Amino acid sequence: MKNTGTLKVTLPTEREIVMTRVFDAPRRLVFDALTKPELFKRWFGPRGWSLVVCEIDLKVGGAWRSVLRGPGGKEMGMRGVYQEIVPPERLVSTEKFDDYPGESLNTLVLVEQGGKTTLTITVLYESQGIRDAVIKSGMEHGAAECYDKLAEMLAPENK
């Protein structure tokens, strides 16, 4: 695959996308930014988009829902259910977009070393066709922008 800025995207199997990004922050702060609505709202979504719905019920079996609104009012909604939660190191949830077929299983792992945190998210799709359609959509650019915004929020001068 390719690197988009500091986001590394790989395709290790026919049905997976793996994204990796290093943040200059302890994993507890990264975990909080992923799971607390008041923080999640500050960084999630590509530049020019706003998060108009942010619901996080952080428990196994709990649901999450996000709706992004882009330029011109276009909305993109997604939702899922938490399958596993191990603070501050692991989150597993389903993910389904309102306007796209299929559901994925997202496994997010945070590893801290030397005050920096490596985020690795493995997205497992129902089929190679769905995975390939996601890649062709340019998803990695939107994800890279989101993680750039998260890095900015986590920067020591912004804490």
List each language-model region with its residue ranges.
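Hydrophobic pocket/interface hotspot
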Residues: V30, F40, W64, Y82, ...
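Intrinsic-disorder/low-complexity, polar/charged segments enriched in Ser/Thr/Lys/Arg/Asp/Glu/Gln
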Residues: E14-T20, R27, L51, A63, ...
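A short, structured loop/turn motif at beta-sheet edges
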Residues: R27-R28, L58-K59, Q83-E89, V109-T118
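Short, surface-exposed charged micro-motifs
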Residues: K8, E55, V81, T107-V109
